[in-house]
């Protein structure tokens, strides 16, 4: 009697589709372009300030590929979004990136395994926690990578607060930053997919006063659902508005 086939995981499904594309194009270039296209598509549905600039970048990428490959990019997008919607408790893109072996070529880069991030997030949460809704709470990761720690932090807070305080995420802002623009966009995609209210900043955290371009800021959809009164109160007290 033959053993039943093991179901194909979303990570395996993504890698299979990606390998089919990489037979004609370089893997690193394909990955960069996929991440750029997915991040831009998400950003341009909620943040119109940089829409034209990002739209031009998107079309410049599309023009590099034949129609079939462009359709395959859409398949990768669907796999990613479905995987994260069905299981928010994971660093999907970080796992795929590692399994493809792409991170090995980037010196000094290490992505925290999600189970480690999950443990750290749960250990950091107090047994009971009540939000002061007169202000915005901030959760920061100055070296976010693909977003493992922030995703785990969001999930830990949701697990503890959602049943008693359904609108808790209107008062918590998750701020991610990384010197690597690719990592920033991987983090941004995943934050958008699981509904994190936040912003991702591309830049060196050691130089917070450095001038940033508008396109260095990636706002998630849920950022725009933060409570306006709490945002204003936070600005009045700290001089910090939004980020």
Segments the model singles out, each with a brief description of its role:
Residues 1-98:
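A short N-terminal interaction module
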Residues 46-51, 105, 129-133:
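Short, solvent-exposed secondary-structure capping/transition elements
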Residues 114-218:
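Conserved S-adenosyl-L-methionine
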